Regions:
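Bacterial N-terminal signal peptides that target proteins for export
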Residues: 1-8
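Hydrophobic h-region of N-terminal signal peptides that target proteins for export
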Residues: 10-19
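Short, conserved catalytic-motif segment at the N-terminal edge
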Residues: 22-76, 99-101, 151, 234, ...
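Short, P/G- and charge-enriched loop/turn segments at secondary-structure junctions
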Residues: 30-32, 75, 162, 322-328, ...
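Short active-site loop at a secondary-structure junction
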Residues: 34-42, 64-125, 160-172, 244-247
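Structural recognition of the beta-strand scaffold that forms the well-ordered cores
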Residues: 42-44, 54, 125-127, 206, ...
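Short, surface-exposed loop or secondary-structure junction motifs
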Residues: 57-59, 116-326
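Structured C-terminal helix/loop/strand segments within mature extracytoplasmic catalytic/sensor domains
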Residues: 327-384
Length: 384
């Protein structure tokens, strides 16, 4: 049945994308399995109107007896995709409702976030990673429980002046998760499903994994030779209770496809509006021409619009070298990726469990090469 659906989808593609281009995509994804970067993957491609192609590759583990990943039912630990799939849209809805102001100081909503120059850190700075906070802190080693982790987060000093430079930081989104809880009055694990995932029709995405879905969930590591799955891989997220602003969501390829279609539709999908076109455009607008970050989203830095350094070929970027100025996306440490290019009406969801016992050294860099090659192949085939 899956093969029939895939073939039908390919037959319905616009002329700019055809079966040959999807065979190239298959070959690129399968090369990552052959090289030992990941045991399996799912790929979902499409545009505003819907999914055009979807497929699962390899297996959930290196054993051929383990299930083949399925775009509809295999749940992946989304890692940092949680930032843009859960936390950021929750903030966007609160902004639209007038409950949060992007340029208000964070301390207005989180009064314990004080000290030094923290009074100048705004909500916007958390979203675009210009707060001045350090990139990372081992809360799981330095604290004993969620309360002590939150206390450490609040007292962590800034490393740079607020607004001065971009430094991608999990701490920014840990704070945003706490902000969503403070303003909404609900735990993140309740608010995000109610305010974001449910309205978006993402029925197979959430914090943690239901018992009925465990056998079809991709493991993200090993312990004493056995697969480890179904609880968040990120140890800081675990310290924060499993549902944190920077990590914690599990989801499927087709659910994430719905989410990207919603953004291509400027906040609307299947007659349901999550937020207004103005809010969608606000969160997808760069602060300046050379910006590499949007509000939550990453802005691929290699494009001819001057954002970042020129990309060397082969391009050492998860997004390749061909995306337009309008493109946006994000990656996750476990091996997850999504991006969309509104100028080409194209989205890509590419989920792997790279973190599960990779057979290749420096699998993060190797996966980046696969992602970049895939992006370039798809964009070139979609360009008249």
């Amino acid at each position: 049945m899956r093969r029939w659906v895939t073939t039908l989808a390919a037959a319905l593609l616009p002329a700019a994308l055809g079966a040959q281009q999807y065979r190239v995509a298959d070959s690129i994804v399968e090369s990552g399995i052959r090289r030992g970067i990941y045991p399996g993957a799912v790929l979902v491609l499409g545009g505003r109107a819907g999914i055009r192609y979807q497929k699962g590759y390899g297996h959930l583990t290196w054993s051929a007896a383990s299930p083949v990943p399925d775009p509809d039912s295999t749940r992946y630990d989304l890692a940092s995709l949680t930032k843009v799939v859960g936390t950021m849209p929750a903030v966007a809805r609160l902004v639209e409702e007038g409950k949060v102001a992007l340029d208000a100081p964070v301390e207005r909503y989180l009064p314990r976030f004080v000290g030094g120059a923290k009074g100048r850190v705004t909500v916007r700075m958390l979203l675009d990673h210009t707060s001045g906070l350090p990139a990372y802190l081992e809360f799981f080693r330095l604290t004993q429980d969620r309360d002590s982790a939150i206390a450490l987060l609040y007292r962590t000093p800034l490393r740079r002046a607020p607004g001065a430079t971009v430094e991608y930081s999990d701490l920014n989104f840990l704070l945003l998760g706490l902000l969503v809880e403070a303003v909404s009055g609900e735990p993140l694990a309740r608010h995000v499903p109610r305010a974001v995932l449910g309205p978006a029709g993402m029925t197979h995405t959430g914090y943690g994994v239901p018992a009925a879905a465990r056998e079809r969930t991709a493991p993200t590591g090993q312990y004493r030779g056995r697969p480890v799955c179904c609880s968040v891989n990120d140890q800081n997220a675990a310290r924060f209770g499993g549902a944190a602003g920077h990590a914690g969501l599990f989801g499927t390829g087709t659910d994430l496809a719905r989410y990207l279609r919603l953004w291509l539709g400027e906040g609307e999908l299947d007659g349901v509006r999550l937020f207004s076109p103005a809010t969608a455009r606000l969160f997808l607008s760069p602060a300046e021409a050379g910006a590499t970050r949007l509000l939550g989203w990453e802005r691929p830095p290699h494009r001819a619009n001057g954002a970042g350094e020129p990309c060397r070929r082969p391009c050492d970027s998860a997004y390749g070298s061909e995306l337009s100025d309008a493109a946006f996306g994000h990656t996750g440490w476990t091996g997850t990726l999504l991006w969309a290019d509104p100028a080409r009406d194209l989205f890509v969801v590419f989920l792997t469990n790279r973190s599960y016992a990779p057979r290749l050294g420096n699998s993060i860099r190797a996966l980046r090469g696969v992602r970049g090659a895939l992006a370039d192949a798809l964009v070139r085939s979609a360009t008249p």
